[in-house]
């Protein structure tokens, strides 16, 4: 957990304690958010590219590993 930012560690603690809901389909949750980020014109092109690249890698790994 040390390598993740404070906000991620905070949300992790909230989910682990039951204060925040757990999403069983974690991959689907991540892909939904990355897709929203990649499509958001309000974000910088660099951030959108990072989101798109991460999502594409997850999709490839999900299909390749099945």
UniProtKB/Swiss-Prot annotation:
This is UPF0253 protein YaeP. Belongs to the UPF0253 family. The gene is yaeP. It comes from Escherichia coli O45:K1 (strain S88 / ExPEC). InterPro entries: UPF0253.
């Amino acid at each position: 957990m040390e390598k993740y930012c404070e906000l991620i560690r905070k949300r992790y603690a909230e989910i682990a304690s039951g204060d925040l809901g757990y999403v069983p389909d974690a991959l689907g949750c991540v892909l939904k958010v990355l897709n929203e980020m990649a499509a958001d014109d309000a974000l910088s092109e660099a951030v959108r590219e990072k989101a798109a690249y991460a999502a594409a890698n997850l999709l490839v790994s999900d299909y390749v590993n099945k």
